[in-house]
């Protein structure tokens, strides 16, 4: 589970910003 940590974090951040 260490293939795309940065990508996952960025995706979650974008999702959070979109939701908020």
Curated annotation (Swiss-Prot):
Entry EC number(s): 1.14.14.1
Top EC class for this record: oxidoreductase
Keywords: Endoplasmic reticulum, Heme, Iron, Membrane, Metal-binding, Microsome, Monooxygenase, Oxidoreductase
Bilayer topology: Peripheral membrane protein
GO biological process: estrogen metabolic process
Membrane is among the record's keywords: yes
Predominant location category: endoplasmic reticulum
Catalysed reactions listed for this entry: an organic molecule + reduced [NADPH--hemoprotein reductase] + O2 = an alcohol + oxidized [NADPH--hemoprotein reductase] + H2O + H(+)
One Gene Ontology molecular-function label: oxidoreductase activity, acting on paired donors, with incorporation or reduction of molecular oxygen, reduced flavin or flavoprotein as one donor, and incorporation of one atom of oxygen
Localization of this protein: Endoplasmic reticulum membrane; Microsome membrane
Requisite cofactors: heme
Entry's transmembrane regions: none
Highest taxon above the source species: Eukaryota
Induction: By phenobarbital.
GO CC list: endoplasmic reticulum membrane
Known function: 6-beta-testosterone hydroxylase.
Family: Belongs to the cytochrome P450 family.
Name of the protein: Cytochrome P450 3A5
């Amino acid at each position: 589970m260490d293939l795309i940590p940065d990508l996952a974090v960025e995706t979650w951040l974008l999702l959070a910003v979109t939701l908020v």
